[in-house]
């Protein structure tokens, strides 16, 4: 998967189209990423008392994973780009921007 944790991405389709956010977590097996502030859902959490006696529960708003095909990585210029790979002088694979050829 070409999108990694910490990347800034732009949502290109879906209900949050046009939103930018930082990837909080990547799920390579499911081809999904968790993006900060994008695809927010309301989750109903049961009441539970913690050790100090305070109860927590109710309706909680949180982010849900979004499919990786619905996001594009934003490069250093602030524009969305596709990702390519090249090998550096040490033989390691480095991600590059397909738009301008710079390292990401």
Swiss-Prot record:
Keywords: Ribonucleoprotein, Ribosomal protein, RNA-binding, rRNA-binding
Biased composition (Basic and acidic residues): 82-92
Biased composition (Basic residues): 93-104
Molecular function GO terms recorded: rRNA binding; structural constituent of ribosome
CDD domains: KOW_RPL26
GO process annotations (BP): translation
InterPro entries linked: KOW, Rib_uL2_dom2, Ribosomal_uL24, Ribosomal_uL24_CS, Ribosomal_uL24_KOW, Translation_prot_SH3-like_sf
Keyword Ribonucleoprotein: yes
Pfam families noted in UniProt: KOW, ribosomal_L24
Region (Disordered): 82-104
GO cellular component: ribonucleoprotein complex; ribosome
Highest taxon, organism lineage: Bacteria
Family matches, as Gene3D superfamilies: 2.30.30.30
Oligomeric form and interacting partners: Part of the 50S ribosomal subunit.
Purpose: One of two assembly initiator proteins, it binds directly to the 5'-end of the 23S rRNA, where it nucleates assembly of the 50S subunit.
Family label: Belongs to the universal ribosomal protein uL24 family.
Protein name: Large ribosomal subunit protein uL24
Species of the source: Nocardia farcinica (strain IFM 10152)
């Amino acid at each position: 998967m070409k999108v990694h944790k910490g990347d800034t991405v732009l949502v290109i389709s879906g209900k949050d189209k046009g939103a930018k956010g930082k990837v909080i977590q990547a799920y390579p097996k499911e081809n999904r990423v968790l993006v900060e502030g994008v695809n927010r859902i309301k989750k109903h959490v049961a009441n539970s008392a913690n050790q100090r006696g305070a109860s927590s529960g109710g309706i909680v708003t949180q982010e849900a994973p979004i499919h990786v095909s619905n996001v594009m990585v934003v490069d250093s210029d602030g524009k969305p780009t596709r990702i390519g790979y090249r090998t550096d002088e040490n033989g390691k694979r480095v991600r590059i921007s397909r738009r301008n050829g710079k390292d990401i």
